[in-house]
């Protein structure tokens, strides 16, 4: 389990969110069988999504989704997080790898390549606010800071770090986001810039001094007052963070509706049932022939649950009007697509 801290620095001129995500990133690595550099890429994105969720989400039921589409061998990644510290994510090519940089560090930028960062904010009403910005470096932290400035008009510093060891296991992972509040004093900004310039990097600080020690170095001379989260029910004064997927056995079975009855019957004949793998978390769901044959022609939106296709009383099928769901997701029906395994 990870944890998230929140607070203010510089006499209230700086809003700070920090996360320790070692266990979360290691679980993602294990679930998806990630290469070392893919681990760093997804780990940075998952940590960054947790930070942005604290900075941007206004209500408990909102979610934020980061989509990185690049020209590099990774093929892209997708991460989703909420304000409760829940995060999940995946990459398109989990075993993709590139040589180390000249300084011996993992080359996340080359693995991601040139492209764009898309950020979706999903509201309880089903509305989705989307913003897309070009990737600055593909290293994730710079790209998120660029997004905050270009799309949210929030000047921020974003630091993300993932260190792997041995066979690729995650040794340490975490991140910090510092948001400059309106009217911040010049001396506060000057001190923050000087501290950032003197930092040896976030990952060494996390490894040697932990999350609190990293914050002390980053905010030296600025003071850091932690937000009291106990009033919100977080008795340890921090938000627990964890890898948490919203998939379940019922949703996995519904995914088989995207196959025709003939295709499902072929699964039963050849495989003795059906198998569905969640692309978000890698969980495997197996279904018996009886379960597969019990499916009815009903398709719901994977995000908001709205009915897309359902049987009417006369036996015919009714289809949702339009090509976009109320939550903003593109409507995909069995004759139009196949689910991602």
Curated annotation (Swiss-Prot):
Q: Which InterPro entries match?
A: Heat_shock_Hsp33, Heat_shock_Hsp33_C, Heat_shock_Hsp33_N
Spell out the CDD domains in the cross-references: Hsp33
A UniProt-annotated Pfam family: HSP33
What happens to this protein after translation, modification-wise?
Under oxidizing conditions two disulfide bonds are formed involving the reactive cysteines. Under reducing conditions zinc is bound to the reactive cysteines and the protein is inactive.
Q: Which UniProt keywords apply?
A: Chaperone, Cytoplasm, Disulfide bond, Redox-active center, Zinc
- GO cellular component: a single term: cytoplasm
Show the GO MF annotations: protein folding chaperone; unfolded protein binding
**Origin: domain of life:** Bacteria
Q: Which family does it belong to?
A: Belongs to the HSP33 family.
The molecule here is called 33 kDa chaperonin
